[in-house]
Amino acid sequence: LFRSDVEKITSLPIVGDVPFSENKSSEGAIVVHENQNDLMAETFRNVRTNVLYMMKSNEKVILVTSTTTGEGKTFIASNLAVSLALLGKKIVIVGLDIRKPGLNKAFQLSRKEQGISQFLANPEHTDLMSLVQVSNINPNLSILPGGPIPPNPTELVARESLPQAIDILKKHFDYIILDTAPIGMVTDTQLISRVANASIYVCRADYTHKADYTLINELGEQKKLPNLCTIINGLDMKKKKYGYYYGYGKYGKYYGYGKKYGYGYGYGAENVNKK
């Protein structure tokens, strides 16, 4: 039943059903850890397997987006990155939602003032790899935060310095995860998609509108996002009869893009309908 409603309104592959996370520990949005075999770890193993199956052996770049804020794209991107690192692969997650960076909070970063926006603005005089931080979660996982919020984010990601940055990262990492802006709110992500090999569209149960699948389907049909798939986030596994209450979620306030920003499911979201 978890997939049935979604399968009726999109033909895109569903690469995962992610349960609701109530984890509010000091480690925040990270729920995947080494030597762990709980439901969440197994869920992200399945997501990892499905996404890698979609990609060719020489493809490295995975883009993660959503329609609006609060659907859990940073949560999904971060835990997928951890799961990939547990394979022994060298992983970097890049904060390309540079209007509202979320990786600082998700990974408890100490150097919050540095990031990719500095390289995009001035690639000739910026050492990109000096902006990359090794995570304290797994030595195989590194983070390239968004950096200072620029006045012109759309123009910045449209520059040739973005593919330059990705080319540099490809020399150092096996996979690159791009945590991008919500595609239903700004055009940044469509511009970023030119450097991606696969795209994950995060939808949240009891929150994502059924009408949003019109946008998702159009993006897939018109190939505006490469190799597009979707993830259903925030399923309440305790409820015996869980329906996707699409059309009842409320996120109008989030369009201000300056309001409270949910970087992971259950973190920072307000007034979400519960059935």
Predicted regions and their residues:
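Residue-level preference for the first positions of well-ordered beta-strands
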Residues: 61-63, 90-92, 141-143, 175-177
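Short boundary/hinge segments that flank catalytic cores
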Residues: 2-90, 96-102, 106-116, 122-125, ...
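Well-ordered beta-strand positions
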Residues: 90, 175, 198-201, 229
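Conserved G/P- and acidic residue-centered "switch" motifs that form tight phosphate/ATP-binding loops
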Residues: 74, 95, 179, 197
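NTP-binding/hydrolysis catalytic cores, primarily Walker-type P-loop NTPases
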Residues: 160-163, 191-193, 274-275
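Short, conserved active-site loop motifs that form the nucleotide-linked donor/cofactor pocket
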Residues: 140-141, 228
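Inter-motif core of Ras-like GTPase G domains
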Residues: 171, 185-206
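Phosphate-binding/switch loop-helix module in NTP-utilizing enzymes
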Residues: 51, 146-187
